[in-house]
């Protein structure tokens, strides 16, 4: 689109010369009819498709307006077997093969869905189809086994090209009613499941029991005689029968019946799912006689060489029999238990010994023949001396909070424990103690004063001794870790140092440091206040005796 051109040059002196307000105004004029005819008026594009040509029908063609009909077609849709068969025998064999394959598939599918279902409807339907195939039709008409729908050219014009619904002529209505879509002789390969109402329905004879587990009725004997007679007649006429898949005749290739040399033995169908009970109360009788039958299972079962009158023997080659008889019920024996997982403590009790005493209810940990508690802070009484005893950290607190007899008993036990724990350490002397005598022994807890935190820190607990040298008479305090014998405290007594009580059970002991440049303060805590007083007296006495010597 080009810009409108100017009539003259625009300058600063003539800037208002193009203003339309000062000049004449052009009035629009209406165009004439000739001018309008020459002009082309643009119209918006239409979404409708042009009707020219034939368009392919869509899936919703029936809902829309009917388009132009296609030319008449003479196509025929034939459903069924062809009108003329080249070889009738080959067609029959193909039908039989297809029927057998469909039957096997139907049986497998039914067993997968319900292993305990009734397959008799499938067998009946199979026999019906097989017999219909065997019967040769009298005359085969070209259109007897086919359903032909011809397209009428006149009717095609009024119908949609994509519609599959064809109107039937008025003249053929009667013929359609008379003629079935599928002739009765044609095979049908559909194995539909039976209705729910008749799935597990038994005949009236099935609900009227014919025998019990322990007795044999007369009706059962008659039924067996009929079966034997029918089987004997079936073996004689096996060559003339045409049924190839029966369960009652011995000449069928798929029959599971007895052999010819065993005609005297009564035969029963292999796949027999019906029960032969004597009365409705047979279930009660089975519960009463179940225990006696289990104990006499060997007597009730007939052997291979013996023939029992009451027992019904299956075929010789039969290994999968689902039927049962009153004298030979189905029984699942429980396997013999080879491995028994039992608690040995529940079966055999350990012999009680006078030396071994059971642990008390308050015992904690592992106890092997003793009543000691290795994880308690206050060790109990024991008659056996040991080299190490558990730590009694909370012994002081438990003593103060105990009542009456309990506190006295703990004092006796702690006293015995203290004597027992110090026996081995006091009697055995360590390195450097060969020429020394121990004048005082006790069990104590050692603390050291920390200058940074300005408090006493625990360094260990163990036996404490005051040893005096035999030659020089000098005394020292020696303490080791309980159990391991690690050295905790080894200080010489000095006359210039002052030893005093810091509490009822605590004794303050100053000592020179290892480098000799400073003084370290130790705190010895014992169990009894009297022990603390004795310790303080020994310290003051031995430091004086050292200076006098």
UniProtKB/Swiss-Prot annotation:
Chain positions covered by the region annotation Disordered: 1-57, 133-193, 207-438
Positions with biased composition (Basic residues): 40-50
Keywords: mRNA transport, Nuclear pore complex, Nucleus, Phosphoprotein, Protein transport, Translocation, Transport
SUPFAM superfamilies: PH domain-like
Residue positions where Phosphoserine is found in the record: 17, 347
Record's function text: Functions as a component of the nuclear pore complex (NPC). NPC components, collectively referred to as nucleoporins (NUPs), can play the role of both NPC structural components and of docking or interaction partners for transiently associated nuclear transport factors. Active directional transport is assured by both, a Phe-Gly (FG) repeat affinity gradient for these transport factors across the NPC and a transport cofactor concentration gradient across the nuclear envelope. May play a role in mitotic spindle formation and/or function.
Protein name per the record: Nucleoporin nup61
Species whose genome carries this gene: Schizosaccharomyces pombe (strain 972 / ATCC 24843)
Gene that encodes the chain: nup61
């Amino acid at each position: 689109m080009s810009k409108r051109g100017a009539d003259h040059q625009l300058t600063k002196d003539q800037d208002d010369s193009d203003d339309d307000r000062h000049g004449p105004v052009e009035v629009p004029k209406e165009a004439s009819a000739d001018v309008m005819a020459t002009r082309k008026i643009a119209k918006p594009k239409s979404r409708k498709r042009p009707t020219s040509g034939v368009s392919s029908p869509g899936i919703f063609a029936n809902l829309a307006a009917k388009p132009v009909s296609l030319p008449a077609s003479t196509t025929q849709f034939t459903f069924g077997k062809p009108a003329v068969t080249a070889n009738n025998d080959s067609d029959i064999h193909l039908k039989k093969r297809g029927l057998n394959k469909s039957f096997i598939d139907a049986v497998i599918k039914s067993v997968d869905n319900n292993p305990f279902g009734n397959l008799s409807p499938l067998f009946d339907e199979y026999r019906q189809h097989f017999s219909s195939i065997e019967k040769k039709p009298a005359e085969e008409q070209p259109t007897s086994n086919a359903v032909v729908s011809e397209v009428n050219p006149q009717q095609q014009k009024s119908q949609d090209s994509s519609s599959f619904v064809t109107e039937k002529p008025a003249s053929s209505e009667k013929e359609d009613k008379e003629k079935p879509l599928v002739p009765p002789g044609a095979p049908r390969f559909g194995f539909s499941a039976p209705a729910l109402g008749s799935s597990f329905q038994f005949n009236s004879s099935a609900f009227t029991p014919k025998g019990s587990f322990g007795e044999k009725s007369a009706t059962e004997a008659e039924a067996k005689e009929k079966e034997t007679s029918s089987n004997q007649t079936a073996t004689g006429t096996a060559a003339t029968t045409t049924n190839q898949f029966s369960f009652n005749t011995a000449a069928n290739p798929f029959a599971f019946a007895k052999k010819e040399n065993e005609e005297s033995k009564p035969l029963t169908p292999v796949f027999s799912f019906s029960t032969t009970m004597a009365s409705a109360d047979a279930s009660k009788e089975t519960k009463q006689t179940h225990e006696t039958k289990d104990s006499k299972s060997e007597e009730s079962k007939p052997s291979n060489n013996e023939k029992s009158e009451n027992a019904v023997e299956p075929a010789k080659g039969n290994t999968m029999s689902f039927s049962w008889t009153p004298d030979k019920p189905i029984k699942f024996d429980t396997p013999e238990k080879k491995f028994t997982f039992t608690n040995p403590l529940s079966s055999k009790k350990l012999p009680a010994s006078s030396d071994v005493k059971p642990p008390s209810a308050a015992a904690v940990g592992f106890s092997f023949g003793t009543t000691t508690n290795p994880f308690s802070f206050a060790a109990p009484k024991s008659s056996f001396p040991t080299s190490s005893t558990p730590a009694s950290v909370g012994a002081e607190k438990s003593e103060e909070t105990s009542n009456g007899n309990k506190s006295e008993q703990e004092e006796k036990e702690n006293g015995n424990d203290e004597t027992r724990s110090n026996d081995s350490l006091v009697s055995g002397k360590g390195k450097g103690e060969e020429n020394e005598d121990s004048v005082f022994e006790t069990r104590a807890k050692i603390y050291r004063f920390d200058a940074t935190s300005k408090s006493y820190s625990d360094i260990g607990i163990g036996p404490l001794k005051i040893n005096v040298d035999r030659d020089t008479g000098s005394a020292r305090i020696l303490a080791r870790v309980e159990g391991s014998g690690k050295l905790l405290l080894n200080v010489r007594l000095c006359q210039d140092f002052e030893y005093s009580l810091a509490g009822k059970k605590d004794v303050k002991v100053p000592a020179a440091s290892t480098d000799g440049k400073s003084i370290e303060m130790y705190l010895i805590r014992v169990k009894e206040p009297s022990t603390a007083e004795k310790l303080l007296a020994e310290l003051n006495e031995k430091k004086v005796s050292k200076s006098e010597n």
